[in-house]
């Protein structure tokens, strides 16, 4: 049941009608008139006020054991009786009960399609959807809910920008600047745009620690004069945290529009889109304790207003005749068709949860886990760890065992209940730069513990001892 502080959406709707102030943690109520939502028109909402986060960070360090009981799946034992050690959070995170409850409460009590409905359930669902948008706007520090578009995820959001902004703005003479550390989601849509327009792609190189110096960025901006710089805030392989605020300033000075892929940042550190000042910021819900099928496309309002829509259909239009159409206002201009209603409700609840834990505390906790993993893995002979020191990375550690296959190591760990990811992690150009075809990746979140990191390091060391060191003794390399 979506009963934060005992309030359901119906109760919230009723109290809103009575003019009661919503409290911070309850599913927030839109600050615009309910009737206009029901009719499908979006008047100017009041800009969400206050800081980017919904609450101040916890003053004390994060205790994962405080939060683990809220995640039903973490109580699970695998078929071989091993407890689950879930270290695949960069791919997708797990869900606290309150997110599952918020979504099932909608399905069980007030689900209906949104906007334009004149019946009670449609009104309640619409209210919950638009309340969720307000929560998302607050979570990222957006100036207005007009700037918060519900997309299917990071990939869909980047493709929307590539189609809507890219097809409108990019010509054969233009250059798009990326980094070599991008996820395929932030490479392929631009390659497709290059196929359509003839524009050029340039890649910022990384150094051996997976970092990029400011002067490399400045030199590329000066030389290539890109129309767009699109970069990840945190590498999903190396864990490197790139200084997006500084680089956005440099890119703007060079006249470029900036897109930030925050898929590995938004769930793990406070995000303030106003401070970053990027033109577009995108991320997914399922890496933030939320459901799949939803993500956020943030765009600066002037830009979104000017841009043509990408997908056409219901909801994104104001009028349609046999001759043509006019578009609706933001944000629905970019939300053709039925939006991810229940997913938005789940995402908002996930954001409230993550905010209750405290994003500063989450960030510090993950850095401690990454530091512990680096300490535990570094002494293992023949292990190559990629990326920068712990103080400049998030909770992601990727490595290979020389002489061992990443798939064998992943299976070995899985038999011990430890879930990591192996392969290219949708970053083939980066792995090519690293000189390997794939890697093993352990990625942490708020519920992971130092004991789990120790279990990982011990199991990797045992794998090395059993399969690499022993076979070397039997067949020493010829000199
Ligand atoms: N960018 C980065 C940095 C990612 O880590 C991911 C997910 N691995 C994506 C984009 C794509 O996200 P999604 O699959 O949710 O669209």
PLM ranges: what are they?
Residues 2-6, 12-16, 24-479:
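Pyridoxal 5′-phosphate
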């Amino acid at each position: 049941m979506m009963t934060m502080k005992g309030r359901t959406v119906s109760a919230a709707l009723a109290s809103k009608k009575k003019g009661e102030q919503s409290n911070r943690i309850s599913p927030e109520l839109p600050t615009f008139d309910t009737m206009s939502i029901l009719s499908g028109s979006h008047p100017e909402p009041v800009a969400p006020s206050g800081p980017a986060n919904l609450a101040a960070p916890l003053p004390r360090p994060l205790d994962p054991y405080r939060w683990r009981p809220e995640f039903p799946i973490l109580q699970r034992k695998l078929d071989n009786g091993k407890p689950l050690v879930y270290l695949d959070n960069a791919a997708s995170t797990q869900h606290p009960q309150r997110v599952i409850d918020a979504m099932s409460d909608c399905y069980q009590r007030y689900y209906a399609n949104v906007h334009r409905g004149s019946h009670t359930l449609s009104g309640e669902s619409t209210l919950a959807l638009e309340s969720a948008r307000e929560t998302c706007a607050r979570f990222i520090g957006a100036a207005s809910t007009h700037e918060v578009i519900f997309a299917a995820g990071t990939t869909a959001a980047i493709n929307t920008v590539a189609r809507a902004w890219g097809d409108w703005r990019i010509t054969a003479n233009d250059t798009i600047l990326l980094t070599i550390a991008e996820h395929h989601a932030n490479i392929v849509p631009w390659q497709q745009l290059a196929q359509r327009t003839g524009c050029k792609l340039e890649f910022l190189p990384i150094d051996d620690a997976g970092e990029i110096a400011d002067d490399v960025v400045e030199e590329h901006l000066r030389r290539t004069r890109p129309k767009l710089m699109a970069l990840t805030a945190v590498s999903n392989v190396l864990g490197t945290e790139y200084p997006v605020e500084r680089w956005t300033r440099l890119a703007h000075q060079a006249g470029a529009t900036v897109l930030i892929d925050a898929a590995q940042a938004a769930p793990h550190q406070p995000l303030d889109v106003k401070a970053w000042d990027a033109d577009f910021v995108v991320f997914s819900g399922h890496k933030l304790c939320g459901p799949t099928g939803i993500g956020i496309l943030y765009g600066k309002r002037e830009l979104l207003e000017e841009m043509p829509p990408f997908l056409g259909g219901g909801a994104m239009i104001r009028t349609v005749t046999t001759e043509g159409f006019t578009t609706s206002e933001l944000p629905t201009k970019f939300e053709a068709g039925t939006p991810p209603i229940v997913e938005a409700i789940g995402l908002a609840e996930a954001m409230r949860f993550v905010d209750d834990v405290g994003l500063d505390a989450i960030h510090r906790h993950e850095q401690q886990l990454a530091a512990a993993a680096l300490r535990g893995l570094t002494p293992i002979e023949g292990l190559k760890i990629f990326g920068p020191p712990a103080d400049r990375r998030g909770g992601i550690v990727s490595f290979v065992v020389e002489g061992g296959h990443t798939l064998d190591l992943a299976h070995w760990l899985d038999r011990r209940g430890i879930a990591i990811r192996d392969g290219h992690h949708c970053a083939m150009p980066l792995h090519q730069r690293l000189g390997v075809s794939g890697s093993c990746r352990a990625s942490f979140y708020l519920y992971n513990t130092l004991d789990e990191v120790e279990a990982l390091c011990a199991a990797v060391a045992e794998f090395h001892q059993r399969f690499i060191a022993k076979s070397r003794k039997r067949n020493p390399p010829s000199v």
